[in-house]
Design a protein with these regions (language model features):
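Secondary-structure boundary elements
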Residues: 13, 70, 76-80, 86, ...
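Hydrophobic/aromatic-rich core segments of domains that either
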Residues: 139, 171-206
Length: 206
């Protein structure tokens, strides 16, 4: 199926402000693009692009003082299939992991493996390695955190989400990723567009 994606964002800056946007399709999906992405700013400003460490297509520019609008539009082809379920997936011992995976075992600003390591091993260390253990992590996080937009906080970390038992989408992801890393399972998550395909319209989207 063809999916039209895009954005229309307005920002107000008190002073000229350097910015980096990551709103383009990931490079791995380049061969699925069917209508090239358009990227427009109002007022027009000079931009340049680069690819970061993770393969994201980033765009740098300086937003002027006052209002600026960012607008983009593109079409991508996607099969619409759900993520595969691989019950036989196994964990790879740390010595055998590819070099490029090791970075996804490290703690980070939002995933404090040092604070959560003992908790992770207490909760999941008895579960046999493999798909089942990762699924147990996801199931635990799903039941442990209460979702609520009013509970959103940009500074909340995985450990705080665990302690407060509340959060939004990113908090679920941060806690699950942190638990996986604590158990030596390389993990990362991808942030994407909020899709409205086949979703009942209840409230205005984010």
């Amino acid at each position: 199926m063809l999916i039209r994606y895009g954005f229309d964002i307005a920002v107000t800056c008190q002073v000229p402000t350097p910015m980096v946007s990551m709103l383009s399709a990931h490079g791995e999906r380049a061969h699925h693009i069917r209508e090239a992405e358009q990227w427009v700013t109002t007022p027009p400003v000079a931009t340049r692009t680069y690819v970061d460490l993770y393969g994201n297509h980033c765009r740098r520019f300086v937003a002027p003082q006052g209002d600026i609008a960012l607008w983009g539009d593109g079409t991508i082809e996607d099969g619409g299939a759900s993520d595969p379920v691989l019950h036989g997936a196994r964990e790879v011992p740390v010595p055998d992991l590819p070099d490029g995976c090791l970075i996804y075992l490290l703690g980070s600003r939002y995933c404090e493996t040092d604070r959560l390591s003992q908790i992770a091993w207490d909760l999941f260390g008895h579960i046999p390695p493999g798909w089942g253990r990762v699924q147990a992590i996801c199931d635990f996080v799903h039941g442990h955190i209460r979702f609520g937009y009013l509970d959103a906080r940009a500074t909340r970390t995985a450990a705080e989400a665990y302690e407060e038992r509340m959060g939004v989408c990113r908090d679920y992801a941060h806690l699950a990723v942190a638990f996986c890393r604590c158990l030596n399972i390389p993990a990362r998550y991808v942030n994407g567009y909020l899709g409205d395909i086949g979703v009942p319209i209840v409230d205005p989207m984010d």
